[in-house]
Amino acid sequence: MPAKHDINKVGVESSDFPILCETCLGPNPYVRMNKQEFGHECKVCNRPFTVFRWNPGEGRMKKTEICTTCAKIKGVCQTCLLDLEFGLPTQVRDAALARKAQAPSSDINKQYYIQNLEAQMAESPDGLAYDSEVANRAGREMLKNLARTDPYYKRNRPHICSFFVKGECKRGAECPFRHEMPKENETQKPSQQSLVDRYYGRNDPVAKKILSQNAESKGLKAPEDKSITTLLFLGLPQCNDSHVRASLVGACPFVKPSDVKSISIVEASHCAFVNFNQRSMAERAADALAAQGGIEVEGKKAKIVWGRARPQKKAAAAVEGSAAPA
């Protein structure tokens, strides 16, 4: 009698070809790859997977960082972990399309989740678990405008030589690293933790910069006064605070009910004041709603603007009153 199959057992992943973007693959149509089965542990699901290594041209050697299953779940490249369709970070894509991160982060739940999705992908006609067509029109238009249409091969360049920066490199032309000083916005190789954050779309500095610039271009620049934590929804239909709260959570899945301090609706002006507990959450919600072109409440699209600080009472009147003669 054969042994019972344990569905919770940590498995392995085997593939014949990687899932890569055009930039990571390089300009050479005759690239040669080295294949190593179970060569490394996937950065996301921690399963041994087939690792591919290649030289994309004159740049450094590159390799796959996550397994093909995790890449199919998110629709990303196995090396740079950017979206395959738009070439943008997953945090930008998910914010524009109002997608919720459903993948669990705990070890046991990840294994169970991966195994179930593998079974679903095996039965699906295209073998994929990510559907990029299910999205609102405004979000897709924003992604198309921000998408990089041509491959950016400079991303494949070797890293900067740290010894050259210190003035201690003695290898000269034989050094495999770049001999130039780093720029202010140039970052080093991301760590494993930052790769995982990029995959799940959280705490990604590149995505935050893209979303902030997009919000500023649409008039949603965050005010300098850090005490302002209010967003104003304009052009609302007849609704109550529960409708506004449900629309906000649906458009911004990262917003929890506890993050919203209060919602005040002014029916005469068809607007609502949404007060957040923290300024960072208000900024993140503003960036996401700007990417979606506003927020839809009860079938009507509403405009989003930042609130203003309340005018402080002038202390001069009180001082003048106290200084008046008796």
Swiss-Prot record:
SUPFAM superfamilies: CCCH zinc finger
Database matches in InterPro entries: Cwc2/Slt11, Nucleotide-bd_a/b_plait_sf, STL11/RBM22-like_N, Torus, Znf_CCCH, Znf_CCCH_sf
Zinc fingers, C3H1-type class: 155-182
Statement: the UniProt record of this protein carries the keyword Chaperone: no
Gene3D superfamilies in alphabetical order: 3.30.70.330, Zinc finger, CCCH-type
Acetylation listed as a keyword: no
GO biological process: mRNA processing; RNA splicing
Recorded GO CC terms: Prp19 complex; U2-type catalytic step 1 spliceosome; U2-type catalytic step 2 spliceosome
Disulfide cysteine pairs (residue numbers): none
Signal peptide stretch: none
Domain of life: Eukaryota
Keywords carried by this UniProt record: Metal-binding, mRNA processing, mRNA splicing, Nucleus, RNA-binding, Spliceosome, Zinc, Zinc-finger
Subcellular locations according to the entry: Nucleus
GO molecular function: pre-mRNA binding; U6 snRNA binding; zinc ion binding
Role description: Involved in pre-mRNA splicing. Facilitates the cooperative formation of U2/U6 helix II in association with stem II in the spliceosome. Binds to RNA.
Family: Belongs to the SLT11 family.
PANTHER family registered for this protein in UniProt: PRE-MRNA-SPLICING FACTOR RBM22
Subunit-structure text: Associated with the spliceosome.
Official protein name in the record: Pre-mRNA-splicing factor SLT11
Biological source species: Cryptococcus neoformans var. neoformans serotype D (strain JEC21 / ATCC MYA-565) (Filobasidiella neoformans)
Gene: SLT11
